Amino acid sequence: MSEKATAETVSKSIADKHDFTKGSMSDSIVRLALPMILAQLVNVLYNIVDRMYLGHMPGDGRLALTGVGVAFPIITIINAFAGLCGSGGAPLCSIERGRGDEGKAERIMGNSLTLLLIFGVFLTGLGYLVKTPVLYLFGASDETIVYANAYMDVYLAGNLFVMLGLGMNPFIESQGFAKTGMLTVVIGAVLNLVLDPLFIFGLKLGVRGAAAATILSQFVSAVWVLRFLSGKKAILRLRISDLRLRGELVKQILALGLSGFTMSVTNSLVQIFCNASLQFYGGDLYVGAMTIIYSVREVVQMPMQGFTQGAQPVLGYNYGAGQNGRVKTGIRFVRRVTISYAVGVWAVLMLFPGAVVRLFNGEAALLEVAVVSMRWHFALFFFMAFQYIGQNVFVSLGKAKQAVFFSLFRKAILGVPLILILPHLWDLGIYGVLGAEPVTNVIGGLACYFTMMRLVWKKL
């Protein structure tokens, strides 16, 4: 057999292996979702470990933790642009692969890379220009601004690498190479876990060391992603000819990615308004408590996010292939797993909040405030499952308008106004700020889910 024939046979066997119209839907989803969950959990955990180390720094640990917590909404907004390209382009690739148009799928991937490069350079420059006033606006005090600025100075220097790794990894996962996608994150995470204590404590770099460890780790992850997508093992490959922006593709990528982008940005906006309100009503102590709570939230939400994102290539591929019955089977499976998980997490956080808080900081005053705040914040957490289910279906099937609307509805339309209004009702004060989250979980989650059932489910 000739080399060309051998290559074609190998390519066909790889493609057949990743044909999601065959086999069990639940098996296909789990096969993709588990590595993605592990990868994203590791990714979140190594960011959380940064905060754990900083929270236990001798002397100024609480202030360092709070300062970095104030900076994280900015980082989340920057990373949302990576998601805009990755979460917008990768599902489109799955749909086009399902239709058999791999050429268009590769053009989508190439255009997504170009968009990432443009956004990365622009946001780095803008970040250096506006970071100090923005950090004050986001809840920094004169005591914590030093730590927030120090972290951002280093982080922005390597921001482009972070965006490339985060934005292009979904294109590995969307082709069915879930383990390779997981390795992207694991490589960076392990390196970060090694460098964190060395830079923070060994070299005595403090918050700058935490940022440097993150940037170096993400650089290695970005190189790994780009090498794989340019190599022979990938089904869809990066090609220089596909980097030229095409207006129609850019429009499709941004339209579909706008849902995840909006969700990330509005999450950050809620955190920003929450931090600013907590600073007003309670000071640095409450902002520090919320830094811990948002860190915990990142960890416990990630399995839901990873699982639903892992289902997207499978649902999108089958939808593109016209297999609507299999799509409904997949949605049922996602619903069952996601709701069960959310209820379990809620029970643990309600019963053992103190043990969780001590992982970050054991200071008595902070512990007391954080335990009460955590119970308020997660009081109705399990309703978040309905938001993830509905949002996942909208994105998987290319329903960009609905996906964007419900991202905005839960946080921008409900969350931010409630944070501003509830503290003034019945003199709730600080508890009004904390109570906004459970209210938005119920209303936003149920509205998204039942709209999906009416507009999408009935038509499948």
Enumerate the language-model features and the residues they cover.
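Short alpha-helical transmembrane segments in multi-pass integral membrane proteins
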Residues: M1-A33, C93-L160, G202-G257, L315-L380, ...
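N-terminal transmembrane alpha-helices
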Residues: F20-M52, H56-D60, P73-G88, L92, ...
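Transmembrane helical elements of multi-pass membrane transporters/channels
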Residues: R31-D50, V154, G165, G188, ...
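Transmembrane alpha-helix boundary and packing residues in multipass membrane permease domains
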Residues: M36, Q40, M52, P91, ...
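Helix-terminus/linker motif at the lipid-water interface of multi-pass membrane proteins
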Residues: L41, L45-T66, L135-D142, L198-L205, ...
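Small-residue hotspots at the loop-to-helix junctions and early N-terminal turns
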Residues: R62-P73, M152, A211, D284-V299, ...
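Small-residue-rich hydrophobic transmembrane alpha-helices
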Residues: L65-G125, V162-G181, N275, A289-P353, ...
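Short runs within selected transmembrane alpha-helices of multi-pass transporters and secretion channels
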Residues: G86, Y155-E173, G181-A189, A210-V223, ...
